[in-house]
Structure formats: structure tokens, C-alpha cells
A protein has these predicted regions:
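Pair of pore-lining "gating" transmembrane helices in MFS-fold secondary transporters
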Residues: 2-27
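Residue-level signature of mid-helix packing/kink "hotspots" within the transmembrane helices
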Residues: 22, 49-58
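Membrane-interface helix caps of multi-pass secondary transporters
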Residues: 23-36, 119
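Helix-to-loop junctions at the C-terminal end of transmembrane segments
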Residues: 56-68
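C-terminal ends and interior cores of transmembrane alpha-helices
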Residues: 78-92
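Paired small-residue
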Residues: 83, 94-102
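Cytoplasmic helix-loop-helix junction between adjacent transmembrane helices
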Residues: 101-128
Length: 128
């Protein structure tokens, strides 16, 4: 029974961690209107996120091996939520750039490899 709830918790954390950075893409026109930015600036935000995410994929495995993957999943969800809160209340494009850079770190470098490692460790040998 605990296995089921742990899987639900991990799936929820992963959904939150990956929804928040992509909200700019999902609600593109609303995002541009709300923050009074241009299409190019919105593209810049996703570029900052994308570059950081690509680098994060390369070092994320090392991070997941070096630190406790369960704690990485938890902390990545907390930090992504805090960064999302800053984005929600920010009116500065510079702050948005910093937060989208941080999203790349929290979602890929900290979360993705740790998430995969936690899922692997939860399963039995015959479930691999």
C-alpha cells in the first residue's frame, strides 16, 4: 500500500516540477500579456531554460549518484515551487530570466536523473 502512495507522490512532484517551467509555453499569449514582454523575450526565457536543461541532463546523473535521490526529488519540487512563486509575483524581465535559468537546474539537473533512480529503486528486480 505504501508503494502505491509513494508512486503517486513521486508522479505528482514530477508533474509540478515540469509544469511550472512550461507554463510560459502552454499559456503563451497570456504570459506575454501578463508580463508585458515581447515574443522574442518569451523565446529568450525558454532559451535560458533550454540551455540550462541540456547541461543539466549531462551532469544530472552524477548529481543523482552523489546525493540522496529521494531528497533531490523533494528539494527540486520545493525549489521549483519557490521559483514559480517568484515568477508569479515578479514584474522584472531580469528576474524572469534568472528564474528560468533556475528552472533548468531544478527540473533537469536535480530532478530528472534522481526521479529515474528513485523509480528504479522502488521496483523489484523482476519489474526492471
Amino acid at each position: 500500500m505504501a508503494y502505491k502512495y509513494l508512486m503517486i507522490l513521486i508522479a505528482t512532484c514530477t508533474t509540478v516540477v515540469y509544469f511550472i517551467p512550461y507554463a510560459c509555453n502552454d499559456f503563451y499569449n497570456h504570459f506575454i500579456d501578463t508580463y508585458h514582454i515581447t515574443y522574442g523575450q518569451a523565446g529568450d526565457l525558454l532559451t535560458f531554460f533550454g540551455i540550462t536543461a541540456v547541461i543539466g541532463y549531462f551532469i544530472g546523473g552524477w548529481v543523482a549518484d552523489k546525493f540522496n535521490p529521494k531528497m533531490l526529488v523533494v528539494w527540486s519540487a520545493i525549489l521549483t515551487g519557490l521559483a514559480g512563486t517568484v515568477v508569479a509575483f515578479s514584474t522584472s524581465f531580469t528576474i524572469l530570466k534568472i528564474m528560468y535559468f533556475l528552472f533548468g537546474i531544478t527540473s533537469t539537473c536535480m530532478h530528472w536523473s534522481a526521479f529515474l533512480k528513485v523509480i528504479k529503486n522502488i521496483g523489484e528486480d523482476d519489474e526492471q
